[in-house]
Design a protein with these regions (language model features):
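Canonical Rossmann dinucleotide-binding motif of NAD(H)/NADP(H)-dependent dehydrogenases/reductases
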Residues: 3-32
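Conserved catalytic-site loops of classical short-chain dehydrogenases/reductases
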Residues: 80-81, 103
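Conserved NAD(P)H cofactor-binding loop of Rossmann-fold oxidoreductase domains
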Residues: 85-90
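A short, exposed helix-loop element centered on a Lys and neighboring polar residues
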Residues: 117-118
């Protein structure tokens, strides 16, 4: 896939794979990269390092995903690539992880991708 000139959104861009993806898209010639994460300060650090734009977003909240898509579209005048990367892990095991944590894992690791697809597709 040709990345040069593309407008890209990366969720989970505050650290790890998301940060690496933001850098990779930038290095491959993306025209603009939005770095989205619930941890705004670290997303801003990533964005600053690549001349991108940071947006705070809890991807487990459908309204925040819609806002992310709108703000990204406004800043970049469109979105060519939406990299839905954000994810979280549970505790040590099934019994040690609270029901509330499982709900959060479900929202972020599963539903966030549904919310993103609904928000970004025409």
């Amino acid at each position: 896939m040709k990345i040069e000139g593309k407008r890209v959104v990366v969720t989970g861009a505050a650290s790890g794979i998301g940060r690496a993806l933001a850098h990779a898209f930038n290095d491959k010639g993306a025209s603009k990269v939005v770095c989205a994460d619930i941890n705004f300060e670290e997303a801003q650090n990533t964005a600053d390092s690549i001349n991108g734009h940071a947006i705070k977003c809890n991807v487990g909240d459908e309204n925040e995903i819609q806002d992310l898509v709108q703000e990204s579209t406004d800043w970049m005048e469109g979105i060519d690539i939406f990299c839905s990367n954000a994810g979280i892990m549970g505790e040590i095991g099934l019994l040690e992880t609270s029901s509330e944590k499982w709900q959060s894992i479900w929202e972020i690791n599963v539903m966030a991708h549904v919310y993103a697809a609904k928000a970004v597709l025409p």
